[in-house]
């Protein structure tokens, strides 16, 4: 049944949902990659669609910005609509020189400065990691399409405008591949409610050099990341 944030019914969503932050990117994915896509959510403008990709039923819905927002949608999709797998497809910022604009990053683990997972985990540190099979299938899908990817840790921040730029030095030292705002929360929700999750991100800007993509590019391109996610779902069915 419908929730305060999703006006859909059981069965409207597929068991796998791709989740970009931007609802307009969700619409772009539905219109570009899915067949027979129909809108299944529009509450607060957070657009959601269900269609098929190469005959496989798949949904896509935005999750907004930040861990609180994405946690609401992820939790409701899992507990109220029977979703089993969530793949975040979003943008991230790079802090290391060897990570370049438009590189695709597969988030094997997600560090964070958020306290959300500590609240879930009785004030202990929770290892927010992706599901191994989802990681493996994403890597295999990228190889099959000859798309280079980076696999490793990303960092989910609570503040987009950081008051502590020295933290970027620490991230670089520890080999963080990308900085974003949601993956650690989605991994925590998936673990709490028995689902599987993965974040695949495209580097949209470089925090060190200032190089960046435009808002339009972020909304309508980054197709490599989307194709990896879609093809990985098919591999997971085999």
From Swiss-Prot:
Catalytic activity: a purine D-ribonucleoside + phosphate = a purine nucleobase + alpha-D-ribose 1-phosphate; a purine 2'-deoxy-D-ribonucleoside + phosphate = a purine nucleobase + 2-deoxy-alpha-D-ribose 1-phosphate
Active-site residues annotated for this sequence: 205
Pfam families: PNP_UDP_1 (PF01048)
Record-level GO cellular component terms: cytosol
EC number(s) per entry: 2.4.2.1
Domain of life, source organism: Bacteria
Coiled coil spans: none
HAMAP family listed in its UniProt record: Pur_nucleosid_phosp (MF_01627)
Protein name listed in UniProt: Purine nucleoside phosphorylase DeoD-type
């Amino acid at each position: 049944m419908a929730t305060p944030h999703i006006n859909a019914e059981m069965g409207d969503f597929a068991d796998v949902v791709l989740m970009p932050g931007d609802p307009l990117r969700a619409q772009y994915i539905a219109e570009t990659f899915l067949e027979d896509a129909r809108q299944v959510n529009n509450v607060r403008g957070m657009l959601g669609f269900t269609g098929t990709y190469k005959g496989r039923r798949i949904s896509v819905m935005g999750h907004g910005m930040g861990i609180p927002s994405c946690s609401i949608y992820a939790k409701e999709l899992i507990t109220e609509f029977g979703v089993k797998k969530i793949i975040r497809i979003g943008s991230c910022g790079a802090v290391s020189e060897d990570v370049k604009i438009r590189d695709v990053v597969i988030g094997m683990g997600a560090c964070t400065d958020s306290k959300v997972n500590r609240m879930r985990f009785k004030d202990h540190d929770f290892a927010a990691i992706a599901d191994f099979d989802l990681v493996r299938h994403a890597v295999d899908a990228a190889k099959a399409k000859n798309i280079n990817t980076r696999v490793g840790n990303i960092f989910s921040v609570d503040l987009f405008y950081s008051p502590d730029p020295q933290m970027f030095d620490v991230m670089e030292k520890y080999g963080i591949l990308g900085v974003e705002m949601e993956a650690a929360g989605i991994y925590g929700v998936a673990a709490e409610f028995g689902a599987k999750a993965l974040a695949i991100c495209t580097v949209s800007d470089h925090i060190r050099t200032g190089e960046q993509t435009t808002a339009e590019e972020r909304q309508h391109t980054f197709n490599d990341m989307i194709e990896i996610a879609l093809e990985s779902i098919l591999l997971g069915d085999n």
